[in-house]
A protein has these predicted regions:
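Short amphipathic alpha-helices in soluble, non-transmembrane regions
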Residues: 69-77
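A generic structural signal for short, non-catalytic loop/turn and secondary-structure boundary residues
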Residues: 31, 54, 100-102, 124
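Catalytic cores of NTP-dependent nucleotidyl/adenyl transfer enzymes across multiple folds
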Residues: 3-7, 102-191
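Active-site nucleotide-donor binding segment shared across nucleotidyl transfer reactions
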Residues: 24-59, 64-70
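General structural signal for secondary-structure boundaries
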Residues: 40, 62-68, 98, 133-136, ...
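Conserved catalytic core of two-metal-ion nucleotidyltransferases
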Residues: 76-120
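Helical scaffold of the NTase/Pol beta-like nucleotidyltransferase catalytic core
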Residues: 1-39, 46, 180-191
Length: 191
């Protein structure tokens, strides 16, 4: 486990931008990590880093109780926005900004019932964190693609959003395909 953890720390150092590392460091220090979980780009990174060399582009976090975000609210402030892209329980996203070298790194917080999402734990920058599982994120990206096409979205269509979900769905689907192919080859060799 220590060798694997060290390898992942090296991977994390390489694939996570310095600004995001600083924001994550603040999150690790301020929040109870047992009361939040990562989704979005960080969950994708954690689920796929053994297969692909991919950067982390955003920080998306789910929580059950807004009171658990108070340490962030008190130090950095949190603003509420309506979310039109994802069907969420509260219909809103909370956003905090972490200043670093004249830049602001955004973290998005979504209210979710943890019992309705498959979570798992993995090391991130040497800390164990909860995040959406491989299966959960694969299903999410595959379900998002038909919902965000130009035909489905009309005037709200964003090609970058469709591209992002299509690409991530393909990465997850490819991993599953390769694992199934390897399993079939192993079975064939054992017969």
């Amino acid at each position: 486990m220590n060798i694997e953890k060290k390898t992942f720390v090296n991977e994390d150092e390489k694939n996570i931008f310095q600004e995001q590392k600083e924001a994550l460091k603040s999150i690790f220090e301020k929040l109870d990590m047992s009361k939040i979980a990562f989704v979005g780009g960080i969950a994708d990174y954690l689920n796929l880093r053994s297969y692909y060399d991919m950067p982390v582009n955003d920080i998306d976090i789910i929580y059950e109780n807004e009171v658990d975000l108070l340490p962030i609210q008190e130090q950095y402030g949190i603003r509420k926005y309506c979310t039109r892209f994802y069907s969420m329980e509260a219909g809103e996203v909370l956003v905090s900004e972490y200043p670093f070298n004249n830049k602001k790194i955004h973290a998005d917080y979504y209210k979710r019932n943890f019992s309705r999402i498959k979570l798992t734990q993995s090391p991130l920058l040497g800390k164990m964190v909860w995040h959406a599982s491989f299966t959960e994120m694969k299903e999410f990206h595959n379900k998002q693609v038909p919902l965000i096409t130009s035909q489905a979205m009309g005037a709200n269509y964003e090609w970058k959003r469709l591209y992002k979900h299509s690409k991530k769905a393909s990465l997850y689907n490819n991993v599953c395909y390769l694992e199934e192919k390897n399993l079939l080859q192993t079975l064939k060799n054992n017969l």
